[in-house]
């Protein structure tokens, strides 16, 4: 395990990438994390880019919160800051495993590595394990590795895992070709096996919380154990660890956003965070930053809880409210509590799925051009909170984009003219918005809610399609905590 005197900058680390999506990165990453945890290692997981779902599995497996690393939203110092904070949180990590996104070189631009997995590998001095979906290829896999190595010599491809292997002969030919033509060792052979598949959803994988609900704790754990068993049989885990130990030392971040700690003697406003099967898209760094800014976090479930807890503000993240719309509608007392809190001026911040929940109603299964949803949803309409105007329609469009926004007024996210980079990822749109509706965010990039505007507001309630990360937008936590503190103080004044 890690020597207590070893600094975070020298913790073994390794990045798992591939030539494209659907190569097996996620299940192989999960299996390797599980295998190392079973051997007693404290594994710190990371995910490149801004996905919420893969990290939910990494967190379940390792017992440590997975963190996102995004080279478009975050500068180099921000990436180092997130990495260092995560490895130091709780017990210091023994190894960091970073799962890439899409292909190794896919990113924001075609002529630079901005926002790519390769960019993260270079910033973190990380050796790369390259996963190849080897279905129907053998010798060609060597050409693939040579091409990826030569494309950017500053990215160290230190090992290969062959996935989707159909037979011993298939494995032998592909392994021999790669090692002969490239000199890169093949450290793993993963057979073609349905046990390596995780249920899909229209935004990617099924979140871990929902996986547990649908499979039951026993079935969910059995699925994860099955993946771990396949990885232990097919991959040289000791060699994987040796490669991770070869990572060069990192520099320390400067001016860490996590070093800003509120006055420990000051009263802590309580912020309710919605967390259940319907709402679970949160960056753990945001929760940490809210705590550091002085908030006490109180979790609650819009699906299961009959009433709001005693709080001074609400944070309702993204998720799949459309899949739990019947349960959310049935919990009328919770919907009424949230609407009353909004009317009373409580600061309520909602992102994407949270925004949808705060509108007047959600319609699912609506036929139309561009309909996109893998999940089977009946054609129906469900009443929601109604704290914000509008009717959420599912399935009419698919938006996946970074966005850039500017606050056009003071609000619970900060001061007028503050700007941010965020992202949006959804299959819904908000219709029937009144002409006089107010928006707090003007977008220079992205879709938003309507006509390039985002951040629909009513009083002190704000809902947006934009997802924010508190390391990229540093005013996020302090602004939301200040709004909650002001609301609490206004209620205790004589």
Swiss-Prot record:
Catalytic residues identified in the record: 352
GO biological process: cobalamin biosynthetic process; methanogenesis
GATase cobBQ-type domain span: 270-475
InterPro entries linked to this entry: CbiA/CobB_synth, Class_I_gatase-like, CobQ/CobB/MinD/ParA_Nub-bd_dom, GATase_3, P-loop_NTPase
Entries under PROSITE patterns matching the protein: GATASE_COBBQ
Keyword flag Ligase: yes
EC number(s) given by UniProt: 6.3.5.11, 6.3.5.12
Keyword Manganese part of the UniProt annotation: no
CDD domains: CobB_N, GATase1_CobB
Pathway in which this enzyme or protein is active: Cofactor biosynthesis; adenosylcobalamin biosynthesis; cob(II)yrinate a,c-diamide from sirohydrochlorin (anaerobic route): step 10/10
Site feature Increases nucleophilicity of active site Cys, where: 467
UniProt keyword list: ATP-binding, Cobalamin biosynthesis, Glutamine amidotransferase, Ligase, Magnesium, Methanogenesis, Nucleotide-binding
Catalytic activity: cob(II)yrinate + 2 L-glutamine + 2 ATP + 2 H2O = cob(II)yrinate a,c diamide + 2 L-glutamate + 2 ADP + 2 phosphate + 2 H(+); Ni-sirohydrochlorin + 2 L-glutamine + 2 ATP + 2 H2O = Ni-sirohydrochlorin a,c-diamide + 2 L-glutamate + 2 ADP + 2 phosphate + 2 H(+)
Cofactor(s) for this UniProt protein: Mg(2+)
Molecular function via GO: ATP binding; cobyrinic acid a,c-diamide synthase activity
PANTHER family linked: COBYRINATE A,C-DIAMIDE SYNTHASE (PTHR43873:SF1)
Misc. remarks from the entry: The a and c carboxylates of cobyrinate and Ni-sirohydrochlorin are activated for nucleophilic attack via formation of a phosphorylated intermediate by ATP. CbiA catalyzes first the amidation of the c-carboxylate, and then that of the a-carboxylate.
Protein family per UniProt: Belongs to the CobB/CbiA family.
Comment block on domains: Comprises of two domains. The C-terminal domain contains the binding site for glutamine and catalyzes the hydrolysis of this substrate to glutamate and ammonia. The N-terminal domain is anticipated to bind ATP, and cobyrinate or Ni-sirohydrochlorin, and catalyzes the ultimate synthesis of the diamide product. The ammonia produced via the glutaminase domain is probably translocated to the adjacent domain via a molecular tunnel, where it reacts with an activated intermediate.
Function: Catalyzes the ATP-dependent amidation of the two carboxylate groups at positions a and c of cobyrinate, using either L-glutamine or ammonia as the nitrogen source (Potential). Involved in the biosynthesis of the unique nickel-containing tetrapyrrole coenzyme F430, the prosthetic group of methyl-coenzyme M reductase (MCR), which plays a key role in methanogenesis and anaerobic methane oxidation. Catalyzes the ATP-dependent amidation of the two carboxylate groups at positions a and c of Ni-sirohydrochlorin, using L-glutamine or ammonia as the nitrogen source.
Name the record gives this protein: Cobyrinate a,c-diamide synthase
Organism: Methanosarcina barkeri (strain Fusaro / DSM 804)
Gene designation: cbiA
């Amino acid at each position: 395990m890690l020597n207590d005197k070893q600094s975070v900058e020298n913790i073994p680390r390794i990045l798992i990438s591939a030539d494209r999506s659907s190569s097996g990165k996620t299940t192989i990453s999960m299996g390797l994390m599980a295998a190392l945890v079973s051997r007693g290692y404290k594994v710190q997981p990371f995910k490149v880019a801004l996905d919420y779902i893969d990290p939910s599995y990494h967190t379940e497996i390792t017992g440590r919160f997975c963190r996102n690393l995004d080279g478009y939203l975050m500068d180099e110092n921000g990436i180092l800051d997130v990495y260092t904070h995560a490895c130091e949180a709780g017990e210091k990590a023994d190894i960091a495993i970073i799962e890439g996104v899409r292909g190794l070189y896919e990113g924001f631009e075609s002529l630079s590595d901005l926002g790519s997995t390769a960019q993260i590998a270079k910033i973190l001095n990380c050796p790369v394990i390259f996963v190849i979906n080897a279905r129907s290829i053998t010798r060609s896999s060597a050409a693939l590795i040579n091409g990826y190595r030569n494309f950017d010599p500053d990215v160290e491809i230190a090992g290969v895992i062959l996935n989707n292997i159909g037979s011993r002969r298939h494995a032998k030919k592909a392994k021999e070709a790669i090692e002969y033509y490239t000199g890169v060792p093949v450290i793993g052979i993963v057979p073609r096996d349905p046990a390596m598949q995780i249920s899909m959803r229209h935004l990617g994988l099924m979140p871990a919380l929902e996986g547990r609900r649908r499979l039951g704790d026993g079935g969910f754990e059995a699925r994860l154990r099955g993946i771990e068993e396949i990885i232990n049989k097919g991959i040289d885990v000791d060699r994987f660890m040796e490669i991770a130990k070869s990572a060069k030392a990192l520099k320390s971040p400067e001016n860490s956003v996590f070093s800003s700690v509120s006055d420990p003697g000051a009263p802590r406003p309580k912020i309710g965070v919605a967390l259940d099967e319907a709402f679970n898209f949160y960056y753990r760094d945001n929760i940490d930053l809210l705590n550091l800014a002085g908030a006490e976090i109180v979790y609650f479930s819009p699906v299961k809880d009959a009433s709001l807890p005693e709080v001074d503000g609400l944070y309702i993240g993204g998720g799949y409210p459309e899949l739990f719309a019947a349960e959310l509608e049935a919990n009328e007392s919770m919907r009424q509590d949230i609407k009353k809190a909004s009317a009373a001026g409580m600061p309520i911040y909602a992102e994407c799925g949270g925004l949808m929940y705060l509108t007047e109603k959600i319609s699912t299964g609506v036929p139309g051009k561009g309909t996109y949803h893998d999940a089977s949803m009946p054609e129906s309409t469900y009443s929601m909170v109604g704290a914000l105007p509008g009717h959420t329609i599912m399935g009419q469009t698919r938006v996946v984009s970074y966005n850039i926004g500017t606050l056009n007024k003071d609000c619970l996210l900060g001061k007028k003219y503050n700007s941010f980079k965020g992202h949006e990822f959804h299959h819904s749109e908000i219709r029937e918005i009144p002409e006089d509706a107010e928006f707090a965010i003007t977008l220079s990039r992205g879709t938003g809610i309507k006509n390039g505007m985002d951040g629909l507001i009513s009083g002190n309630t704000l809902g947006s399609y934009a997802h924010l990360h508190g390391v990229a937008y540093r005013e996020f936590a302090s602004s939301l905590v200040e709004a909650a503190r002001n609301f609490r103080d206004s209620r205790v004044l004589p």
